[in-house]
Amino acid sequence: MPRRRVIGQRKILPDPKFGSELLAKFVNILMVDGKKSTAEAIVYSALETLAQRSGKNELEAFEVALDNVRPTVEVKSRRVGGSTYQVPVEVRPVRRNALAMRWIVEAARKRGDKSMALRLANELTDAADNKGTAVKKREDVHRMAEANKAFAHYRW
């Protein structure tokens, strides 16, 4: 690690349709092989479907879905005296968003629906209703942290 200075986070340009940095990050996570316009088309189509189902505007519905997947605690491995402990630590806000988005995209890719836009829309709808694979993933992470609460004093 460099000792001189801390390098700041890169600024992400907000997405052209809604002007949201969060949505731009989501598009970047979904993007494969640098095909951003394809990723944008998929996300916008999914958000349109989500908005029709939920009755809210696209950005609001996306925020609700993302909020239900964001983890508050996770476990990190810590080696102490020859044995490894899973130590629960709080998740930083930037990482919360990144994990939530990654989990939603992974869950959508594993679904068996026809198009990616439909898979993503279904996963976001499930996330907004507090069900689905991405929400289950968050619950599993929280359960792991709760189970290993005894090792919280090993935090660094």
From Swiss-Prot:
One Gene Ontology CC term in the entry: small ribosomal subunit
Q: Which GO terms describe its molecular function?
A: rRNA binding; structural constituent of ribosome; tRNA binding
Instruction: Tell me if tRNA-binding is a UniProt keyword of this record.
Output: yes
Keywords of this entry: Ribonucleoprotein, Ribosomal protein, RNA-binding, rRNA-binding, tRNA-binding
Keyword Cell wall biogenesis/degradation (UniProt): no
Q: Which InterPro entries match?
A: Ribosomal_uS7, Ribosomal_uS7_bac/org-type, Ribosomal_uS7_CS, Ribosomal_uS7_dom, Ribosomal_uS7_dom_sf
Gene Ontology BP terms: translation
PROSITE patterns the UniProt entry points to: RIBOSOMAL_S7 (PS00052)
Coiled-coil ranges from the UniProt annotation: none
Role played = One of the primary rRNA binding proteins, it binds directly to 16S rRNA where it nucleates assembly of the head domain of the 30S subunit. Is located at the subunit interface close to the decoding center, probably blocks exit of the E-site tRNA.
Q: Which HAMAP family match?
A: Ribosomal_uS7_B
Question: By its UniProt entry, which NCBIfam families does this protein fall under?
Answer: rpsG_bact
The entry's family comment says: Belongs to the universal ribosomal protein uS7 family.
- Subunit details for this protein? Part of the 30S ribosomal subunit. Contacts proteins S9 and S11.
Q: Name it.
A: Small ribosomal subunit protein uS7
